């Protein structure tokens, strides 16, 4: 397989990976640049006085000797080509990988306005660039950015050289990264950011959170993760932005907790009592309306008398072992019904009084008495229903039967007996723990029963209960919040979450959860506080003095490179690339935009620092 890059044709075995092609091409050009630096310079005409060595001229430049101004100007003039070398190196690598994949040549050759300098002072300028940036010996002129402007900048020339070289070192790294992105292959159809990514970015930015590139394009292996982590701790790197991101996310979480409000268990009990009580009153109103229409019409009591006689006979067989309270109540009721003139309303009153007389002051209804009471009550209800059917018709009879049942058992019907008993006990004893056993039930059926019995205030209290429970476990930690929300979503297949957080409340929580999850790197980023960073930088500056700034400039270049990579423009360009089909005009435009945007962005970051 043949690959042409920067006028040089390479032969690779079929099946060679794009990563290996890129590495080989990069290594070849780096070697050429290193060899060129080691070749002896052209012989100059011998001056009348001994000529200074290259490093002596570099020393004059650093110490500000008598000819420093002239040296700086000539060094700057000699270095004017370096930004074009950087772009050409990146373009060659991108083209090599693209062609290795069978694609077209993506970028044209970069125009170089000036031949390689031979002036010794210009060479001294290049040497200073390489001296301050250890990486220059490997990457050659591709690694060193344009420092020609250093001659016209305010301040120390050597310091400006270090900063500008750091800028261009970052540019070279980003271009290489863009080339590798091409080599991995990108699948999509249009030169736009994917809709789901755009929506997430818009949502995050509306909340004040700025997603970084590595938030949207996750590092895929240990090496790329280490690059990201290194950038967070490097001088002029992304640590400050990560710390700012974390602070905003924590504030978002606190604001959400405040907006939802605290949880008061009594609000839920009152809401259910009010709602269910309203249903009971409605059922009672239907029943009362039928009673009024029935008036004083006489009612047959055949079913009632038969049920009473059956239970009296059973009790009398027991002799002295029989429940005397129940036996007396049955005989008294039979006497009242046999007295005649029993109308509809009077039969209803007898039914209510009978249960009260049998139960008395007992907290628990005796099983034998309960069975007999239910049998007699049901018989009396049949007599009442038959009377309504004869006087008002079958529809009113059915309506009466339902309203009567709802009035007597509304709590058990709406909530179920277990929940109703628990809430009744909690209300009488005011124990939040009992209420919480119902509110935080792990049974979706219980939650749905409760939810349907709540008014809007009660539903707000129910949501507050769950959010308050999450807040207790998470504090102001977005990472813990994400974990707890994930647990709630997974509980009972999501039925409980979908019931409590429906509609706009679900959209709000989901949006917050998605933004915090997408930017979760700031929770574990290797960042330091402003005080720590302020102490760290003087230490780094002091440590860099013995090496004349080598380590400092290299770290600054790396930090700036990662800072720009994580910026909004580069993030959007790479997302656009990730959603664009290779070889299309839209792809070429997106790639060119990414390449040409790197240099000014890096320079701007350096200026801001």
From Swiss-Prot:
Q: Does the keyword Repeat apply?
A: no
Does the keyword Transmembrane belong to this entry? no
Broad class of where this protein is predominantly found? virion
Highest taxon of the lineage: Viruses
As for subcellular location, the record says: Virion
GO CC, alphabetical: virion component
A biological process from GO: symbiont genome ejection through host cell envelope, short tail mechanism
Q: Which UniProt keywords apply?
A: Late protein, Viral genome ejection through host cell envelope, Viral penetration into host cytoplasm, Viral short tail ejection system, Virion, Virus entry into host cell
Provide the coiled-coil residue spans: none
The record's region (Disordered) falls at 32-52
Entry function: Inner capsid protein that plays a role in viral DNA ejection into the host cell.
What is the name of this protein? Internal virion protein gp16
Q: Which gene encodes it?
A: 16
